[in-house]
Amino acid sequence: MPTVWQLLFLLLVVAIVYVYALRFAQRFLQQDALARQHAAAAPLMHFAFQRARAVDCALNRLPCVTSQQCRDNCVIASAASDLTCDNGFCSATNILADAQAPGSAIECDPALGLLRVYAAGGDFVVSQTCVSTYRDLVDDTGAARPYLCDAGALRLELDTTPFSADACTCAAGYDKLMFRQTALARTVPVCIPTHAASLYRRVYG
């Protein structure tokens, strides 16, 4: 027959096991509830990129969403490599592919704000190209931006005269309005059809 002390010891052991089991069950339920809350609040998709910069994107197809992710995660094999996100994968292209050789004749019109620059690649290949100093008005090829005086005549002499709205003369049937993007951006003239000018004046000055 068990004694009273043996029964008390057995009850104490059962009580200790019960308390520990109850605490474990409560902790498990709390962790499960927190995991469900985090899963409900998390976005459906999450793109994680390592910043080890150990992937050669010229040989491996690394998934991407923006070109900045490629610049952060790809190995820059050459100073003449340009890393871009093309169709969802990082690709390394030669930025000097369209450049002219140093000995060839290349014209960079200073009236359009173009400067001749020389680029040296990682293989000591030197090429020259034109770079626009008025990138909001003219691209590197000397072509005016499509929104700049697109239905009129544009006269640019940026090497001698600062740019102004007077450089644009709109064609007949068009009104010249001013496009102000932000306080820090340049105001550019745009040509709007006369029949729609009253509507566009709510956006353009």
Curated annotation (Swiss-Prot):
Pfam families the record matches: PIF3
InterPro entries reported for this sequence: PIF3
Domain of life: Viruses
UniProt lineage: Viruses, Viruses incertae sedis, Naldaviricetes, Lefavirales, Baculoviridae
Protein name per the record: Uncharacterized 22.1 kDa protein
